[in-house]
């Protein structure tokens, strides 16, 4: 449970910089909303594709309960130091930026070098057989050292025992610190490139194999990636740029808005560009996606005057774009639900995992 609480705290504190308004409650039939199918209780079927509404009541799923006869996997942690990284030596923001007077889509931010240490938490299922190539799920905003997540491992224990998902290794990667433009976390998660996936492939996963003795599958069909907020945008970016490595994506409150820094004229709207032409104008990629947004998700028009900072609008547009291109996706709109809602995530995570592995 601590991971969920920590994750929500980090994301909300980072997003709630000066002058951030209280998000309004968006109607399920508001502007830009798809035609949702109402689920009166629980979650959509794990095999169902399309757009769904759930809530406003949420409950912890039975998969969170420790069950007799279910073998528990092992959870270990180790740390990685930024001084050893060729990809991300570390930065930190001096102060939150100011809008660029010459570019409504850019923020002027000053940052400085800063070392950091990140914790890698690894779950290995009890069913893993040494020497075999294990399926894999990577999760962003992983827990701190000494506070390993119990939610995802427990859910995986039960789903694997019920043969609803394959026995998979979970690699939970702590971010490099800070949030939004100018921060290490922002640089890792909000940049529109394959760099973060390449960092994980070159530095993190070899370290996981060395520390745990597991062998990880290299096939995209055997790998999923999951995150919340900017971590969700990062998850999709990893799959989009490297579908040979990742083909299954779980996105909670995805930051498919303009939060990229430094400004890149090739993608001037940051992750907003995914649903503003990038996906529509690209060949279909082998990506299967589960995604969510809350009716009280983030809305921040004050950072920049670009109309690209409404999380609900961004996710509605993302779902519509995926549908138009024929992607396999399930989109959940949650009632009475804020950004990265812990209750919502607990209830839906088993079904989300089952959907992307279907």
Q: Where would I find each of the regions flagged by the language model?
A:
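Bacterial N-terminal signal peptides
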Residues: 5-14
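Non-catalytic cap/lid and distal C-terminal segments of serine-dependent acyl enzymes
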Residues: 21-358
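Boundary at the C-terminal end of the N-terminal hydrophobic targeting segment
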Residues: 16-20
């Amino acid at each position: 449970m601590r991971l969920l609480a920590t994750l929500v705290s980090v994301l909300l504190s980072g997003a709630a910089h000066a002058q951030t308004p209280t998000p309004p409650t968006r109607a399920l039939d508001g502007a830009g909303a798809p035609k949702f199918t109402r689920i009166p209780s629980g979650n959509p079927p794990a095999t169902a594709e399309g757009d769904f509404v759930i809530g406003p009541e949420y409950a912890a799923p039975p998969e969170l309960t420790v069950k007799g006869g279910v073998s528990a996997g092992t959870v270990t942690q180790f740390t990685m130091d930024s001084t050893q990284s060729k990809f991300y030596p570390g930065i930190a923001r001096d102060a939150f930026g100011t809008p660029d007077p010459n570019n409504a889509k850019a923020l002027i931010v000053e940052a400085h070098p800063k070392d950091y240490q990140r914790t890698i938490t690894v779950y290995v299922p009890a069913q893993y057989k040494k020497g075999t190539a294990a399926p894999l799920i990577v999760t962003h905003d992983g827990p701190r050292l000494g506070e390993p997540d119990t939610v995802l491992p427990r859910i995986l224990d039960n789903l694997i025992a019920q043969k609803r998902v394959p026995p998979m290794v979970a690699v939970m990667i702590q971010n490099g610190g800070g949030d939004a433009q100018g921060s290490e976390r922002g640089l890792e998660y909000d940049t529109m490139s394959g760099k973060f996936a390449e960092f994980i492939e070159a530095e993190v996963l070899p370290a996981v194999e060395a520390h745990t003795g597991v062998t990880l599958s290299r096939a995209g069909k055997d790998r999923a990636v999951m995150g919340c907020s900017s971590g969700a945008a990062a998850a999709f970016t990893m799959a989009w740029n490297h579908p040979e490595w990742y083909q299954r994506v779980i996105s909670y409150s995805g930051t498919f808005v303009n939060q990229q820094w430094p400004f890149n004229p090739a993608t001037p709207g940051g992750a907003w560009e995914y649903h503003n032409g990038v996906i529509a104008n690209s060949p279909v990629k082998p990506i299967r996606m589960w995604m969510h947004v809350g009716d009280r998700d983030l809305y921040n028009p004050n950072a920049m005057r670009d109309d690209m900072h409404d999380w609900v609008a961004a996710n509605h547009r993302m779902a519509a774009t995926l549908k138009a291109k024929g992607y396999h996706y399930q989109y959940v709109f949650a009632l009475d639900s804020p950004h990265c809602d812990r209750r919502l995530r607990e209830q839906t995570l088993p079904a989300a995992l089952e959907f992307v592995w279907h």
